[in-house]
């Protein structure tokens, strides 16, 4: 009764040893022998042993950088066993290696549900896969479809929204199409100030400043930014944003005032460089050549990583 499973295990152990020695031919010989023995009369013990064989084969295929082969072995496992943590981990590795980001994302969600990772590690992995999933979109319509496949909690993550807007820009979408994605992010940032860390605020402001300059001047946005600036006077990035939008509205004096206050205090290099560059352009507009040269020099001195 126990002989076939024991013989199969012996071959699997020998195959594992051959794999460790990088002897693919010997590994294949022992594995093939195990598969032949597994074709006998079915039993619960035999099924479990063959599941182990499939999992081992999937792991070896991944080691050989053959993700498609690994997925074929995993697909041969019964559904109950396929949902076990080890099988899901192997499927996650295989789908990531095979650049099947949507399937990898679904698998990572299952692993998170099963508690296979810490909360922090699971969220980081899922965020990475969400962004890869969005990167697979090659036009705005595909991006909207990919976005709709995300879970609500994933769509609410500021870094995911920002990644989606940046992807839209890369796909050549007009700025008017990008603004509806940024507006809720802005509203949450100013209505729930604890929802965004300073580094995230800097990224949101940078993306907003770029996008707002590509749409017609909007008085409502100007008023909203000015209210936020007055509500959070210590958020220097809002002075920068106000200055950039005032410049877009041809409010030269106020733009200069805001940017001159913000530029020396900004900690984010890209924001600071843009502030100095815009001040240089304002000085050139007023034909203040010497002042413009000073600002251009300061912009050049900012090192952007």
Where are these regions (language model features)?
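Structural register within alpha-helical repeat arrays
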Residues: 7, 14, 57, 91, ...
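Membrane-proximal soluble helical/coiled-coil segments
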Residues: 1-78, 82-84
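Start-of-helix register in tetratricopeptide repeats
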Residues: 5, 9, 45-52, 86, ...
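Alpha-helical repeat scaffolds
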Residues: 26-37, 66-78, 101-114, 138-153, ...
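Flexible helix-coil transition and linker loops at the boundaries of alpha-helical arrays
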Residues: 2-5, 38-48, 115-120, 148-155, ...
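Structural motif corresponding to the intra-repeat A-B loop/turn of tetratricopeptide repeats
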Residues: 21, 64, 98, 136-137, ...
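Residue at a conserved register position within TPR or TPR-like alpha-solenoid repeats
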Residues: 11, 18, 61, 95, ...
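Alpha-helical adaptor scaffolds
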Residues: 46, 50-63, 194-268
């Amino acid at each position: 009764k126990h002989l076939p499973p024991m013989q199969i295990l012996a071959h699997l152990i020998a195959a594992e040893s051959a794999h460790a020695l990088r002897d693919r031919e010997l590994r294949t010989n022992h594995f093939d022998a195990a598969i032949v023995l597994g074709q006998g009369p079915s039993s619960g013990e035999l099924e479990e042993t063959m599941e182990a064989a499939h999992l081992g084969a999937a792991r070896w295929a991944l080691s050989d950088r053959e993700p498609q082969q690994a997925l074929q072995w995993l697909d041969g496992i019964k559904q109950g066993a396929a949902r076990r943590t080890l099988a899901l981990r192997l499927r996650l590795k295989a789908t990531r290696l095979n650049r099947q980001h949507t399937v990898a994302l679904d698998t990572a969600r299952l692993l998170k549900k099963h508690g296979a990772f810490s909360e922090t590690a699971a969220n980081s992995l899922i965020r990475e896969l969400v962004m890869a999933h969005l990167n697979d979109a090659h036009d705005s319509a595909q991006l909207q479809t990919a976005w709709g496949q995300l879970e609500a909690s994933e769509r609410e993550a500021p870094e995911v929204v920002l990644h989606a807007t940046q992807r839209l820009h890369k796909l050549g979408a007009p700025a008017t199409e990008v603004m509806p994605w940024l507006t809720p992010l802005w509203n949450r940032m100013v209505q729930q100030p604890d929802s965004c860390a300073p580094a995230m605020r800097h990224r949101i402001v940078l993306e907003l400043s770029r996008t707002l300059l590509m749409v017609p001047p909007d008085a409502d946005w100007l008023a909203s930014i000015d209210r936020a600036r007055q509500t959070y006077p210590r958020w220097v990035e809002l002075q920068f944003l106000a200055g950039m939008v005032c410049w877009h509205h041809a409010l030269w004096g106020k733009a200069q005032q805001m940017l001159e206050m913000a530029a020396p205090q900004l900690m984010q290099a890209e924001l600071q460089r843009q502030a100095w560059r815009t001040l240089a352009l304002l000085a050139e507009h007023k034909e203040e050549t010497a002042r413009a040269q000073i600002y251009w020099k300061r912009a050049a001195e900012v090192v952007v990583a």
